[in-house]
């Protein structure tokens, strides 16, 4: 589906929604340091569907090292930061770039200046791996 943007916000219908914390895709609080999460979907159930959320890292924010519970993609929408995977080597990442983590892969994300990312998790996200 193609979306057409207009110059007037009044011309664009906007659907606002929210999920109760018990039914929203939000990681455990102990993983987040100065990171806010805006869930876009309900959690995946038994790997049968995908889940997504916007993560906003404040300057100095960090998603601490942890294993991916299911395959996931982190796509940076704005800002920049650093990511590390199973090898623990930190690499820079910036707006327009994405990283894939396999199920069980240890990883971490941080930002000294602030970063906004879309995180998509689900059994099928690995099919997008390697695409431009």
Give residue ranges: language-model regions.
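A cytosolic small-molecule/anion-sensing beta-strand core signal
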Residues: 77-78, 94, 113
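Short acidic-glycine-tyrosine-enriched beta hairpin
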Residues: 87-104
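Short, conserved beta-strand element in jelly-roll/cupin
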Residues: 56-58, 67-83
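Conserved short histidine dyad/triad with adjacent acidic residue
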Residues: 38, 51-68, 103
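Short, surface-exposed secondary-structure edge patches
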Residues: 54, 73, 89-91
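A short hydrophobic beta-strand segment most commonly corresponding to one strand
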Residues: 100, 113-130
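A short, N-terminal "cap"/entry segment at the start of jelly-roll beta-barrel domains
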Residues: 1-49, 131-132
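Short beta-strand His + acidic residue motifs that chelate non-heme Fe in jelly-roll/DSBH
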Residues: 63-65, 83-84, 101, 106-112, ...
